[in-house]
Amino acid sequence: MTQFKSLFNIGFEFFDAEGSAMTDPNSYLAATPLDMVRQFSRIMDTPLDREYRQNSAIDRLRLRLLQEEFDEVCAAEDDENLLKELADLAYVTFLYAATFGWDLDEAIRRVHASNMSKLGPDGKPVYRDDGKVLKGKNYQAPDLSDLVCD
């Protein structure tokens, strides 16, 4: 039987009767991706909420991990593997943002709202020849300035 052992302010911690971290994905239904990468970082003893410095050792590590995951996405051989690699890429992306104290959940909400403003003057999407949705005249860039640490 699973018991709830403790609750931290940066996500949910579920443990089994022996005190092992739960590996059942259903244990994390109430957690956001940010909650989960913060939990991972805490348990794996990898510090978060650092000041961002471009080309610092931690920045280079996070970029290498993103590149590794992207390469694995490109090399995926079937649908299930592709989905797994896309999830890994998203997870590492959330971990990268959390490393520097950035709330990627909120950034994605704002980028989504911005993307929804890409309609043309007639209220319909405008497409490039390859199918990419272009920015219409009503496009509003997201304001993320309050989400980044100075």
Residue ranges of each PLM-predicted region?
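Flexible "arm" and connector segments at domain edges
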Residues: 4-86, 90-150
